[in-house]
Amino acid sequence: MANYSTSEFKSGLKILMDGDPYAIIENEFVKPGKGQAFNRVKVRNLKTGRVLEKTFKSGDSVEAADVMDTNMQYLYTDGEFWHFMVPDTFEQHAAGEAAVADAIKWLKEQDMCVVTLWNGVPLAVSPPNFVELTITQCDPGVRGDTAQGGTKPATLETGAVVKVPLFVEEGEKVRVDTRTGEYVSRV
């Protein structure tokens, strides 16, 4: 298994601590006036999502986590698990609710997304940055309601609620940024 020295730490690096995979969020190199230099690191546990702050002496090394980001196709949900498939090998993986988390409201069947695997177990699911979804329910926008451009809430086919401009109607397809949850454009 590969090891990373503290000099190789950077955001996004996946490391193994106490038997759990962690992703480095922030890394700060500190050289005090007196004493040994150290790295102050903020890490997120990929299994639980908890964020911790750890310090490593300069020159320490940590084990690399065997974490892979894989492009997979979302197939279906059986109520308890969300099932994904690798398109090339047709290998299927079932992810629990903790792994899918907020991605639930952006996923529709046959969509491609990135699944983070650790020892063959899905840890996290990342939807594509932009998704195109149909509006299933929204109030009609009445002309003259506002002086400037206003917005109204709209429910999408996946159940997510997004604020859309008044001119967007029920049944239309809209593009949504999944990172912010905001309306981008009509399709």
Swiss-Prot record:
Q: What does its PTM field state?
A: May be beta-lysylated on the epsilon-amino group of Lys-34 by the combined action of EpmA and EpmB, and then hydroxylated on the C5 position of the same residue by EpmC (if this protein is present). Lysylation is critical for the stimulatory effect of EF-P on peptide-bond formation. The lysylation moiety may extend toward the peptidyltransferase center and stabilize the terminal 3-CCA end of the tRNA. Hydroxylation of the C5 position on Lys-34 may allow additional potential stabilizing hydrogen-bond interactions with the P-tRNA.
Give the record's pathway. Answer: Protein biosynthesis; polypeptide chain elongation
| UniProt-listed Pfam families | EFP (PF01132), EFP_N (PF08207), Elong-fact-P_C (PF09285)
Example GO CC term: the record gives: cytoplasm
Q: Which GO terms describe its molecular function?
A: translation elongation factor activity
Disulfide bond entries: none
CDD domains under this entry? S1_EF-P_repeat_1, S1_EF-P_repeat_2
Its GO biological process annotations read:
peptide biosynthetic process
> Per its UniProt record, what InterPro entries does this chain match?
Elong-fact-P_C, NA-bd_OB-fold, Rib_uL2_dom2, Transl_elong_fac_P/YeiP, Transl_elong_KOW-like, Transl_elong_P/YeiP_cen, Transl_elong_P/YeiP_CS, Transl_elongation_fac_P
Modified positions (N6-(3,6-diaminohexanoyl)-5-hydroxylysine) are K34
The record, for PROSITE patterns, names:
EFP
Compartment(s) where it occurs, according to its Swiss-Prot or TrEMBL record: Cytoplasm
Family, as annotated: Belongs to the elongation factor P family.
What is the role of the protein in this entry? Involved in peptide bond synthesis. Alleviates ribosome stalling that occurs when 3 or more consecutive Pro residues or the sequence PPG is present in a protein, possibly by augmenting the peptidyl transferase activity of the ribosome. Modification of Lys-34 is required for alleviation.
Q: What is this protein called?
A: Elongation factor P
- This protein's species is Thioalkalivibrio sulfidiphilus (strain HL-EbGR7)
